[in-house]
A protein has these predicted regions:
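Active-site acidic short loop of glycosyltransferases
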Residues: 88-90, 120, 146, 167
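Structural microenvironment flanking redox-active thiols in thiol-disulfide oxidoreductases
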Residues: 106-144, 156-162
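Oxidative protein folding and maturation machinery
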Residues: 1-82
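Conserved redox-active cysteine motifs that mediate thiol-disulfide chemistry
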Residues: 88-89, 95-113
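Generic structural signal for well-ordered beta-strand positions
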Residues: 82-83, 183
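Thiol/disulfide oxidoreductase modules built on the thioredoxin-like
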Residues: 146, 153-203
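Conserved hydrophobic packing residues within short motifs/helices of P-loop NTPase cores
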Residues: 94, 126-128, 151, 174
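Alpha/beta-hydrolase fold active-site loops
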Residues: 91-92, 171
Length: 207
């Protein structure tokens, strides 16, 4: 009935707000919907929400603009350790992806277009895969002649870098400044036409 639909809707709205980090005045919003929630499982979820809010606030604070991520290291296709600090002096555009993620793969042509469009500018293109099977990742790189700097996050979602940036799903894109500090930990997708214009603005301003 309408009451059940309303209850389902408000629970889903709160869930997505917490997940996406829309935390402004959320405690009051939860208090306002509490009278609409009747189901035991929803009440239990609502009672657990403050813990999730605290975790979300911490993860978003950990990846706030200005946060230094340059100390993190990953493995490249040759098995060498690569540090994000290696790219200091250039902006870093990071693509968090995996070979089994169709939306991630759909962004690859747009990343390549941006690479060509911004060739010669002080920016590097880093793709960090969350594949747990290294061979699958390596085969994909070879088969698709992948460009840019290809790294793998061997611990998947358990890697401290993943926890710090508050990654909840892929693809996710990050932009770091020339010191390896966060400009945006969840920036626009390359397929969004605004992304190219934003990068051009930032890079032209830095020259």
């Amino acid at each position: 009935d309408n009451e059940e639909l309303r209850e389902s809707y408000v629970m889903e709205a709160i869930y997505w707000d917490v997940l996406r980090g829309y935390l402004y005045d959320i405690e009051n919003r939860i208090a306002n919907i509490r009278s609409l929630v009747k189901k035991a499982e929803n009440l239990e979820t609502l009672n657990e929400t403050p813990v999730r809010i605290a975790e979300a606030r911490k993860s978003f604070a950990d990846a706030m603009p200005g946060t230094d991520l340059s100390h993190y290291t990953f493995e490249d296709a040759q098995g060498k350790t690569v540090s994000l600090a290696d790219f200091k002096g250039k902006y870093v555009f990071i693509d968090m992806w995996s070979t089994g993620c169709n939306p991630c793969i759909g962004e690859i042509p747009y990343i390549r277009d941006l690479e060509k469009r911004l060739s010669g500018k002080p920016i590097v293109w880093v793709s960090i895969s969350l594949d747990l099977n290294k061979k699958v990742w390596l085969d994909f790189l070879q088969k698709n002649n992948m460009s840019g700097i290809q790294l793998i996050c061997d611990k998947g979602f358990k890697h401290p870098f993943i926890k710090q940036i508050g990654l909840s799903g892929i693809p996710q894109f990050l932009l770091l400044d020339k010191e390896g500090k966060v400009i945006d930990a969840n920036t626009l997708r390359p397929s969004n036409p605004v992304m190219g214009k934003l990068l051009e603005f930032i890079l032209n301003r830095s020259e």
